[in-house]
């Protein structure tokens, strides 16, 4: 795929029908031109991947707020888990602490196929995931383009 060049060496590489990888940006220090380019990429590709980021909880929230007001995280399963002082950060993890307790809201099981908060009267426009540890391969986080699915339906 051909990469699109945007402000200060920011590179948008489309990954196919859905998604793009954004390269050459530090989300903790992104300026207005980069944020605008990221928003335009999001509008076009729906799912964006930013590899190699090192964000604090404050950085994650500041970047997230460029896309609008934050919705409170849901309370599910083992209960909502947030870092102390960061109720808008929702920890999802399959890791258990030294006492055997899940450190994240979903315990150590896989989440079922779902759409984030689609049950809400006004669902959020997006979800932001920040992975601290990822497997070398696999990992079962997948995305589906409902726009592409609709375009491929027959008229019948």
Task: Annotate each language-model stretch with its function.
Residues 1-156:
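Non-heme Fe(II) oxygenase catalytic core, chiefly the N-lobe of the double-stranded beta-helix
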